[in-house]
Amino acid sequence: TNTTRPINNLDQKDNTKQILWGDTHVHTTYSMDAFYMSLPMMHGSRGAFPAAFACDYARFISQLDFYVLTDHAESYIPRTWKDQVDSIRQCNAISGNEDNPDLVAFIGWEWTQAGATPETHYGHHNVIFKDYKEGQIPDRPIAAAGALSNVLRTQLADVNRNLFLLDPLNKDYYLSFADYLDAILSTPNCEEGIPSNYLPKDCYESATTPGELYAKLDDWGFDVEVIPHGTTWGFYTPQAASWEEYTQTPDNIRPDYNSLVEIYSGHGNSEV
């Protein structure tokens, strides 16, 4: 049966809302953990996929209305951040009429924090920008400081630099992985005490708490949504972690940034 579903119900007089389907948490292999899992040794994949694949997958496979690139900020280098931004702009450029596109792509990142105790644990947050044009997004992502950042940037490099020795037939993939690890480690840290929008483009910026993240976003002044993600699951969440601890510091709660909170994703459920 070939049934056509109208986009709008024209008989409805007050048709002010429309249900849209999208994904606010899309990773590419620019995220170090995803790159690692894409290596042939892990499950037979063939190396890293470019950001443009996310656009094609959202449009032709998932048939979404929108998606957001939110790779781990801790895995970014200046070149890959530029690649992601360019891919979003290219995706939107081929989406048809700007007033009624077939797909809308947004840019952002995942602030990937984990604390050892409930008092220092804030979890991951997806940072999503309303616009994607030049001058409407930050020059660089803002990562989370702490242990998980160290794993994504330093420890993976220390452990996995010589994987090609275990699988020499696919050594080119592992050498590319090692090159990316080296590029991450060679990115200098941003100088502290300088407003985010005055820092150079090619440094690595981080924030220890949500409040510090919001203060840096304030420096830019762009429209942005920050969605807490996976706050109660995962190997990195300490026992007894709760919103009660999270909200002890007023700076961590910003209604102008936090109008949404994730309840469920494919990773797990915050209600159980």
Regions of interest found by a model, annotated:
Residues 1-272:
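Extended, charged catalytic domains and RNA/DNA-binding interfaces, predominantly
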